[in-house]
Structure formats: structure tokens, C-alpha cells
Amino acid sequence: MTVKEIFELRREGRVEEAYNAILPMYRVHHGKYTSRAMFWCAVDMMNLLLGIAVDQSAESLAALDEAEKIYLSLQRLAPKIIDESGSCQQTVINLGEALKSTHIRVKQ
């Protein structure tokens, strides 16, 4: 699968497929476009997981735990992406706030 095809999966809303497709590619190649695809697929996946984390059920807590792991990865990845607009850094900030509010809501 190519990076272009992965971005197409994202556009089609096939978040999990796109995320699962980029992971093995990113493990062996950290080029400009692969890194961007990894970043945006991880953002999509984190948003999906935060939507699942709604209560203290095992599924919700597992989703929240996975979202936290992805967030830490995004914090490491964002500075490596050439992003003159600052949208990657802003996205990480916004996701941090979303993660914090979800964590508070779920853990109450």
C-alpha cells in the first residue's frame, strides 16, 4: 500500500484501516510523506478512541489507555514534521486538552 492510498482511506473515513496500514510502513521508513501520514492517521485514531472512552467500562478504559499512548507518540513525532503553518503542534495541543477532559470525565 502507498502513502497516497493511506490518505485515501482517511478521506473515506476508514480510520482504523489507514492507521493499521501506516504502522508497518512507518516502522521502516520515516520520510516526509510517511511521517505526515503517520501523524494524521494517529490523530484520527486518537479522536476515534476518545469517542469510545465514555465511561468506566473495560472497553472505554482500554480506549483511553490506547489514546494516551498515541498522544505520547504524537508529541514525539510532531516536532519532526516540517510544518510551517504550525498545524501539527496546534493539533497536539488540542488533543492534549481533549485527552485531559476525557480522562476527567471517564475517571469520575
Regions found by a protein language model. Name each.
Residues 1-21:
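Alpha-helical segment of the N-proximal tetratricopeptide repeat
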Residues 1-4, 35-54, 86-105:
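Amphipathic alpha-helical repeat scaffolds of TPR domains
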Residues 10, 22, 64-67, 71:
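Inward-facing hydrophobic residues that define packing positions of alpha-helical scaffold repeats
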Residues 28-30, 49, 56, 71-81:
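Alpha-helical junction/boundary sensor with strong preference for TPR arrays
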